[in-house]
Amino acid sequence: PTGAFMGSSYYRTPFPVRLWVWNAFSQSDDALSRWITKVFGSKPKLMANVNPQLRAQVAEHQLDKLGYFNGKVDYEVLTQSNPKEAKVAYKVDLGHLWRLDSIAYLNFPEHGRQLIDSTMSEAIIKKGRPFKVSSLEQERQRLTRLFRNHGYYFYQNGYASYLADTVNTPGKVNLRLAMVDSIEPEATRQWYIGNININFKKQFMEEMTDSFVRRYLKFRYAGKKMPIRAGVVLRELKLRPRKLYMVDDETRAKAGLQSMGLFSYTNVQYVPRTTQVIDSLGNIQYRDTLDANIDLVFDKPYDFYIEANAKGKTTGRVGPELVVGLTKRNAFRGGEKLDINFHGSHEWQTINGQSGSSSKINSYEFGSDVSLSFPSIITPWNAFRTMAQNERRFRNGHMPHRYYGTPTTTVKASMNILNRAGYFRRHVAGGELTYDWATSYQHRHSFSPLILSYEYMNYTSPKFDSIMNNNVYVATSMADRFIPKMSYTYTYRSAQKYRSPIVWSTTVSEAGNVLSLGYLLAGKKWSEDGKTMFKNEYSQFFKMETDFVKYWTLNPTSTLVAHLNAGVIWSYGNSSQAPYTEMFYVGGANSIRAFNVRGIGPGKQDYSDLSNKYANILRTGDIKFQANLEYRPRIWGDLYGALFLDAGNVWMKDADLSENEAFKFGEFYKQMAVGTGVGIRYDMGMFVVRVDWGIGLHLPYDTGKSGFYNIPSFKKNQSLHLAVGYPF
């Protein structure tokens, strides 16, 4: 209807702003009015264009497809007090629901009938279920996949048709699914994989000049040597010579090769032929064989990327963030990805605070990461296993794990420098080993058995030292230390068929417990502190964080997104406080957008004094909760708008430190910072560029103003963020 609320076909918004814009500007001929009408207006829906009679006929046709053969749909036009407005009321009489009474499968070959009988528990159509057209088609698709997974390569959906009898029993359907008489002969025979030719190309039309043959496998390529080692491709290629053709093997092979990220184009074609084989009795038999030709076109070897974020706040704090990186595909002919990136950010004060003018850079951070990803799970047990050894294991019945996509093993080293001008310079050096894999589209896992980092102060000023002397909690969190960590992340996402999916990710990590267990076996107490690693104290903690996103597709051009994020960290044993880099914070382009990073918290503690320039050091916590709601309508083309509401804060677990900072279950919801705002997003296909304007609504501490809206200055509680990608 005109002024539909959130895309609803029934409810209308009480304020049809787009209709008002249309009425106000559509009759004007000037360019500005035409632009306003096109961008912000919405043409009213006319009864002449609705055609309720046709809609009623379409609805009856849909009822037939659902099994309501006697369903009736009538309509009535309801006039309103305004003669220009009217509503259409539809009356739907479902009638009797026709159900399946008997089901028979006819004319299938003997082996095909055996396959059907052995999988009847998986049948979509069963006695007593509604007679739905969609269910009938799903059953035909099930049989097609069943047959093609047992060698019937040429079998198609159209080779079976339905006969339905609705006369014998009122309200019941006797159904027959029969194979058609004009089926091609090869569709009733089982086919086996024969020779496999794999063609490596750097360009689609490249001529291949050399080849390498290994039994039934032939690799063709251009140049003096193969561009990639054979075993890398064979790990993803589920097709094997002399094996019965299975469509699922072909599907997994294509998906696996694509997920490697090395090829821009993959294609599998089959050439049928008849071969002679000798059975166990020495008799010659003829076998239908499919020779596979697989074309693999390499993607560009290098990827250069730039990621940028910018932020500005009306209190005067501004600064950009930049990431520049280079990725080399197939770095060492083993499908590896070598990634090198440099990142940096800085922030400065542009207006006068209580301490006077400050135009110099207040803080900056820069660093570099180097990572190498392998397209397999590499462990000490399989790191040096050869291709021939893998083939022998396969013949001996050791089936490889089946993954959704290509699993990866990533080795990473990093170095970061954090500088707070006039206070400190902190260095963080680290390395990690991570395994990523997926068992299906819905379930993904990431396990890091070793994440080792060393954090130390390269420089501290006397002013910073005096601050630390007066704040033991912050001093402990920023002390020099090793962090030997282990982490696991599980991500669930709804199946692709759902209109309104969810994504739920949970990360559990720990640090120092394995080392402390070793010390415990050596006779030291678990709770004893001061234990060292390489002559430096190490951290000991347990951390959990969960992230939940829900999408509602309101209509083809607008989406509503809800986001929840929560986390908690416990420090114990060798640590009285978690490291500064592991603490939680809120604010910024991907959090509460009305406030800067580390601009709020912990709890209802007030660090709003501009003279307190080290406040962002203190605005961290052991506990975090954040909630976001964002409406994303399309404005036109690839330009989308955003209307959002953000809330959240961080707290400390230890109430002894400060009453204002401590988490209390009965009061935490009262200490949530709240902000709103609007934004625009430009979808460029490969990535999204967005600008968000955040406006503060509520601060968790006492500002001297009563009521929910307690912002002391509207002008000073706004933030502008330029970022790449969606916030969640």
Where are these regions (language model features)?
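Strand-connecting loop/turn motifs
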Residues: 68, 152, 170, 301, ...
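Gram-negative/organellar outer-membrane beta-barrel architecture
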Residues: 115, 226-227, 246-505, 593-594, ...
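Interaction-mediating elements
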Residues: 1-259, 265-268, 289
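Membrane-embedded beta-strand positions of outer-membrane beta-barrel proteins
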Residues: 306-308, 338-342, 411-413, 504-508, ...
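Solvent-exposed coil/turn segments that connect beta secondary-structure elements
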Residues: 76-78, 91-97, 105-110, 178-184, ...
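In a subset of proteins, long, contiguous C-terminal domains/tails are tracked
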Residues: 503-505, 528, 532, 541-546, ...
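C-terminal outer-membrane beta-barrel translocator/porin domains of Gram-negative envelope proteins
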Residues: 215, 219, 223, 311-315, ...
